[in-house]
Amino acid sequence: MKRTYQPSKLVRKRRHGFRARMSTKGGQKVLAARRARGRKRLSA
C-alpha cells in the first residue's frame, strides 16, 4: 500500500508557503493569527 505522505519541497511551498497564504483572504487571516500568537515561523 502506498503511504499518504510523499514529501515534495515544491508542493509543500506551493500549498503551504507564504505566497500561497497571502493569495487568499483566509490565508491572510491565518498569517495574522500566527503573528498575533507570536509564532516564530509563519508558514512553510
From Swiss-Prot:
Ranges annotated as spanning the membrane: none
**InterPro entries in UniProt:** Ribosomal_bL34, Ribosomal_bL34_CS
Q: Where is this region: Disordered?
A: 1-44
Q: Which residues form the signal peptide?
A: none
Sorted alphabetically, the Gene Ontology BP terms of this entry are: translation
GO MF assignments: structural constituent of ribosome
What are the protein's UniProt keywords?
Ribonucleoprotein, Ribosomal protein
- One Pfam family from the record: Ribosomal_L34
Gene Ontology CC: one annotated term:
ribosome
Family assignment from sequence similarity: Belongs to the bacterial ribosomal protein bL34 family.
Name by which UniProt lists this protein: Large ribosomal subunit protein bL34
Q: Which organism is it from?
A: Sinorhizobium fredii (strain NBRC 101917 / NGR234)
Gene assigned in the entry: rpmH
